[in-house]
Regions:
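A cross-family phosphate/adenosyl-ligand binding-site feature
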Residues: 3, 14-77, 81-82
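Short, glycine-rich nucleotide/cofactor-binding loops
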Residues: 5-12, 99
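Short beta-strand segments
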Residues: 6, 32-34, 64, 88-91, ...
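Short, Asp-centered acidic motifs that coordinate Mg2+ and/or phosphate
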Residues: 85
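Glycine/threonine-rich flexible loop motifs
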Residues: 94-103
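Hydrophobic/aromatic ligand-binding patch that stacks against planar heteroaromatic rings
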Residues: 108-112
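Glycine-rich phosphate/pyrophosphate-binding loops
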Residues: 113-135
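Electrostatically charged, flexible surface regions
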Residues: 134-267
């Protein structure tokens, strides 16, 4: 059993270390992670410069690229055979709702899914001290279920864990992605030279109320498990947009005629 572990917080992140150690009881663990923090790297791929790989230990590699780069290098080059399972995390901070669109943690799991590897993103609530041991225990439990039962096609698991001791967590809930609102997400400042610069930041002020919302599970002390599908097509809206297929195209005869060379007139 071969397990690939990666993240977006970097190779030296405590969450990565704790997760890899916990998974060593399940199978042979390979760690391939960015050489520095790559938070909010989303699904970026490095195309215009070479990637450097440094081996830091037995089956432990640091990559000078994004989380998605790490997954590609690991699955397609570094590992002797593709892994049976991929886990990305444990991320410092939750990846709930809209966060998944920006998260390098979740994107690494998405890339694993694209490459045909059953994958799970693991994130933990908090900002200072983290109960990564509790997060790792839940991650291992879900990982065993994935290995036993598999995942639906093109589907990954987004696991978020409240920052509590293991015995204080109230269980696991299957949830949906929620929506959030921010207050003043762009901060404008002036540097000592009088030039304007910006921080993309802001304070989350509310979550949308929806059935089985992921953030509500975390607020109530439960682990949030959200299945995410790669196909983001809004299938329910296809019929509505099909009427746009009747938008008039240029008259074929007129287009053909305009492309024909004009005959020379006799003088």
């Amino acid at each position: 059993m071969r397990i690939l572990v990666t993240n977006d917080d970097g190779i030296h992140s405590p969450g990565l270390t704790v997760l890899a150690k916990a998974l060593s009881r399940v199978g042979e663990v390979w760690v391939v992670a960015p050489d520095r923090e790559r938070t909010a790297a989303a699904h970026a791929v490095t195309l215009h410069k070479p990637l450097r790989v440094q081996q830091l230990g037995t089956r432990v590699y640091a990559v000078s690229g994004t989380p998605v780069d790490c997954v590609n290098l690991a699955v397609l080059k570094l590992l002797p055979t593709p892994p049976d399972l991929l886990l990305s995390g444990i991320n410092r901070g939750v990846n709930l709702g809209d966060d998944v669109l920006y998260s390098g943690t979740v994107s690494a799991a998405m890339e694993g899914t694209i490459l045909g590897v059953p994958s799970m993103a693991v994130s933990q609530e908090g900002q200072g001290q983290f109960h990564f041991d509790a997060g790792a225990r839940y991650a291992v439990r879900i990982a065993r279920l994935i290995l036993k039962e598999g995942l639906p096609d093109e589907t990954l698991v987004n696991l978020n864990i409240p920052n509590r001791p293991f015995r204080s967590i109230t269980g696991v809930r299957v949830t949906c992605l929620s929506r959030r609102r921010f207050d003043n997400p762009i901060i404008e400042k002036i540097d000592p030279h009088g030039r304007t610069y910006y921080w993309i930041a802001g304070t989350r002020i509310s979550w949308s109320r929806s059935k089985d919302a992921d953030y509500e599970a975390i607020e109530q002390g439960a682990v949030s498990l959200t299945p995410i599908h790669l196909d983001t097509t809004h299938h329910g809206a296809l019929d509505r947009f099909r009427k746009w297929e009747t938008v008039r195209r240029p008259n074929a005869r007129r287009v053909t005629a305009s492309l024909k060379p004009k005959s020379k007139q006799r003088s």
